[in-house]
């Protein structure tokens, strides 16, 4: 009997192995909605976790695996290291001649030298605990205050440090900081939308079947967003803010950016609302692969302040393990795949040859 079961067990083990490896070896031939195309721009970028434009031709890339910030010329594929020796960099912001760098547990400010290198580093914040997750993207509000995304140390727990599972505000000069929003399990990125406010992604707990969905949230200063009390029976705990958008559980919604009105990619007109695009890494926590896609999120304003609804659709799929994305000044979309050595893709309207 055992001899007959061995081939079946071996097949199941093989299928599970293929399932785990699939996202890391896929993504080179993504699918996209009709009328648009995806093209490979560059390879061997390490473990890309952020994309920031220095200008129209040079893209700065956080390489988590290499512990560095790389400058990539998207026209020639020439590249150079602007800063190395970092511990898992996940975020970068260019602001007033300085580079604000987010790495695991630490936020630092560097002067940008005439040759573009990052020099004379100053630690703004340090000592943020890391565990299951770490500190992620850093962005900025119109008043100059930084927004720093800080992940939880665990799947579900009560954090010992209130700076975990939170969005933090940080003074870009002094490093003074505090909690801007709590109950945010693992928010990777966010984007400021003029005349509206800050929208951010968040990824819920694992190992609970179809609960909870990944989220798009609207930031209200001082608000709580539910974790770790968001049980299946109370998905939006009393006193917490509900998400404005929900997506497939355990798929990891990460980088997010605002579609410019001049972009050729589909989206709402200003009179209708606005459109965000986000990268969905994909799940290791499901039997079958889910995620591995780029989403279009149409956002509509309600009649009440801070009241938003969304319509979310897949735009690119079979995309491997995308993490960061950003719109180019010309309106085309760029995203990077974390697995497979790190690849950069661009998305634009298909060339009809006319």
Segments and roles (model prediction):
Residues 66-67, 105-108, 340-342:
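Loop/turn residues immediately N-terminal
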Residues 44-57, 84-104, 128-146, 182-197, ...:
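Beta-rich, blade/repeat-based domains predominating
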Residues 60-75:
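Beta-propeller domains
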Residues 54, 62, 102-104, 149-151, ...:
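Residue-level marker for isolated small/hydroxyl-bearing positions within beta-strands
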Residues 105-141, 151-152:
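Asp-box/WD-like beta-propeller blade repeats and closely related beta-sheet repeat scaffolds
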Residues 22-32, 135, 152-156, 165, ...:
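Beta-propeller domain segments
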Residues 38-43, 78-83, 122-128, 176-180, ...:
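A short beta-strand motif characteristic of beta-propeller blades
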């Amino acid at each position: 009997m055992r001899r007959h079961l061995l081939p079946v067990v071996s097949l199941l083990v093989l299928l599970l192995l293929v399932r785990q490896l699939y996202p890391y070896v896929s993504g080179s031939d993504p699918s996209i909605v009709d009328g648009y195309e995806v093209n490979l721009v560059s390879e061997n970028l390490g473990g890309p976790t952020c994309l920031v434009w220095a200008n129209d031709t040079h893209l700065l890339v956080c390489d988590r695996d290499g512990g560095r910030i790389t400058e990539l010329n998207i026209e020639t594929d020439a590249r150079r290291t602007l800063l190395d020796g970092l511990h898992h960099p996940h975020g970068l912001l260019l602001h007033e001649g300085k580079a604000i760098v987010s790495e695991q547990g630490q936020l630092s400010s560097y002067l940008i030298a005439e040759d573009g290198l990052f020099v004379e580093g100053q630690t703004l914040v340090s000592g943020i605990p890391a565990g299951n997750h770490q500190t992620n993207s850093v962005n900025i509000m119109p008043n100059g205050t930084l927004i720093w995304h800080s992940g939880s140390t665990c799947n579900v727990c009560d954090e010992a440090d209130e700076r975990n599972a939170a969005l933090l505000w940080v003074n870009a000069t002094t490093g003074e900081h505090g909690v801007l929003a709590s109950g945010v399990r693992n928010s990777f990125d966010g984007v400021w939308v003029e005349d509206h406010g800050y929208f951010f992604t968040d990824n819920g707990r694992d190992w609970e079947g179809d609960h909870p969905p990944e989220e798009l949230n609207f930031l209200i200063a001082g608000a709580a967003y539910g974790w770790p009390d968001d049980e299946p029976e109370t998905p939006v705990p009393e006193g917490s803010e509900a998400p404005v958008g929900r997506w497939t559980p355990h798929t990891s919604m990460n980088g997010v950016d605002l579609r410019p009105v001049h972009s050729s990619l589909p989206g709402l007109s200003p009179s209708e609302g606005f459109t965000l695009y986000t990268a969905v890494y994909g799940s290791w926590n499901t039997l079958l692969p889910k995620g591995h896609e780029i989403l279009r999120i149409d956002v509509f304003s309600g009649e009440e302040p801070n009241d938003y609804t969304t319509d979310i659709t897949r735009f690119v799929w079979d995309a491997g393990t995308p993490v960061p994305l950003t719109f180019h000044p010309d309106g085309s979309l760029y995203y990077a795949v974390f697995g497979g050595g790190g690849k950069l893709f661009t998305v634009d309207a298909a060339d009809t040859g006319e």
